């Protein structure tokens, strides 16, 4: 049985992707799953710091630049069943990864002896990020209540749909498609718009890939929720995406603001290990139960593990 791949991303930096990725990984490991975390923030790898680790000589750059097998660059953490691959360290010489390189990485990850492989992406919709999202079993988008975070996530979703279109069309048809969308946006001056309706009604384009995208919907987690309004933000984002993108978003839950998080970051200990009885533990358990077994109502899982 091949490893399942979860990819955690966001349109904006500083919204808690690394915190969420590490917490999901820890929770899965406590549920007796074998988990590998991969730091895919090409310009600012820091997932290792969350676990109090120092930089390793072997990291993801060895895989891409020296063809080192993945099994030779991951290492165990002090948490049972949880392993880690550190990200790029030569950020002064950024690496632009191709679609083919990412596809090979996905194939190699599935062959590893893990139940789950979680990617912690850098901010924004690079081609490598979008290709990983397209290939993933679970596509997890992180937002907080800041308007800039919400806006950039809409941009990320828009870019993801366009990337999906590109991978499912010929170069000529994709060029026509981009021109049609650009003309529509300039005419309406809107930040988001209905891809599917415009392409079908005005340009004659028809696609069935929207239905295929719905088979693995984007999952949304709202981080650092401080109020009921913040908790309800996920439902608002879901509604907007359905209206303008004709895309279903699954709002899997929110993670409440907790001072224990920044305190644990300063001490370089994962919050779910340093403070195991924080309410965050139950929130991440609920999310993981929803993702690993969507037929169950994860809202009933509030036990601290």
What do these predicted regions represent?
Residues 210, 215-216, 221-224, 242-270:
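Beta-strand-loop-alpha "switch" segments that mediate conformational coupling across diverse proteins
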Residues 40-115, 171, 182-186, 211, ...:
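P-loop/Walker-type NTP enzyme "switch/lid" segment
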Residues 95, 121, 125-132:
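Conserved ATPase-coupling elements of RecA-like P-loop NTPase cores
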Residues 165-218:
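Short mixed-charge
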Residues 4-69, 116, 129:
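Walker A/P-loop NTP-binding active-site region of P-loop NTPases
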Residues 128-148:
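Inter-motif core of Ras-like GTPase G domains
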Residues 248, 262-305:
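NTP-binding/hydrolysis catalytic cores, primarily Walker-type P-loop NTPases
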Residues 11, 144-145, 170-186, 218-231, ...:
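G-domain G4 guanine-recognition motif of GTPases
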